[in-house]
Amino acid sequence: PSNYIRNEIRLFAIENNLEYLNQRNHEGLLRTLMIRTASTGEIMVLIQFFEENKVQRELIMNHLAETFPEITSLQYVINSKANDTLYDQDIKLYKGRDYILEEMEGLKFSINAKSFYQTNSDQAYELYKITREFAGLTGNEVVYDLYTGTGTIAQFVSKKAKKVVGVEAVPEAI
């Protein structure tokens, strides 16, 4: 579904003269697009606008909400900074929830726009299984998951460890 959404945004932007950000002269509206699709089928779409233009913003957000009712979380942010980082930005919920649910081995994870999470859910699952296997846990260890993000790795190894401690510096990433 992410390619359909991405392509629709591109087509809609062209048809409605919505300009993409030009990094050199700092002009334009559309900055970046983040689409997350969980293995549960839930979809998060976050559009980063360079400047506030309520008419154009609502035009594209309404179009997405109507064209793709399957979007679980539709969000946007106005970011006029020199970089694209989101952690210090105020993300606005346009429609749905401000998170999507990911599920692996019966464990459920809430993923929000600022969560650190692997971009490929299927490969993340394989990576976590290998991580758990390589750890060779016997059930007596205390495991520290530094920069834990959503805590997926910590939770994966928790079944085979005495105790797991997740440490994260960015509260919104949890």
Where are the predicted features?
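Short helix/loop segment immediately N-terminal to the Walker
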Residues: 20-27, 143
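Core structural elements
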Residues: 27-39
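Short, aliphatic-rich beta-strand segments
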Residues: 35, 41-50, 108-112
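Rossmann-like S-adenosyl-L-methionine
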Residues: 56-58, 62-174
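Extended interfacial segments that mediate partner engagement and assembly in macromolecular machines
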Residues: 1-19
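Active-site pocket-lining segments that scaffold enzyme catalytic pockets across diverse folds
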Residues: 52-54
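Short, contiguous clusters of charged residues that form electrostatic/catalytic patches at enzyme active sites
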Residues: 7, 11, 28, 125-129, ...
